[in-house]
């Protein structure tokens, strides 16, 4: 019986062992759009539980953007909204994102996965989120909207 147990024992070969020192990790960016999205990004970042994630805040309301704790901030629609937001007009939100599309694309470059988070009750989140999701797709990132 003892010899049978020895035969049935399996051992992992060196090739089958998981490599704990892997250099492969996804480049993840979480983008908060508008007031609701920026609040969500601030909460996530301030929780301290998420490591290896870059947080980006995008808004037309300059004052609200200042309060967001994301390290990377993009103030969109400067010429269009003068920093006062979109007044709940999604078309203004879309135009504001288009106005800064190249900066958005540059920020998203290199991302493997982009989460776009926004509240859909206002103009910036509702109007700019689809433009930002398109930009993320253009840079080759898997894009998830929340």
Please give the residue ranges for each predicted region.
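Tubulin/FtsZ superfamily GTPase core signature
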Residues: 1-146
């Amino acid at each position: 019986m003892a010899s049978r147990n020895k035969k049935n024992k399996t051992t992992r070969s060196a090739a089958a062992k998981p490599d704990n020192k892997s250099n492969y990790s996804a480049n993840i960016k979480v983008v908060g759009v508008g007031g609701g999205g920026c609040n969500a990004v601030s909460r996530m970042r301030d929780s301290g539980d998420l490591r290896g994630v870059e947080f980006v805040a995008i808004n037309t309301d300059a004052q609200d953007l200042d309060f967001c704790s994301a390290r990377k901030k993009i103030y969109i629609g400067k010429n269009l909204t003068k920093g006062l937001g979109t007044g709940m007009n999604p078309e203004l939100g879309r135009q504001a994102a288009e106005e800064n599309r190249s900066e958005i694309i540059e920020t998203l470059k290199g991302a493997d996965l982009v989460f776009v988070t926004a509240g859909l009750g206002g103009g910036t989140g509702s109007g700019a989120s689809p433009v930002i999701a398109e930009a993320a797709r253009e840079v080759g990132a898997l894009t998830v909207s929340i």
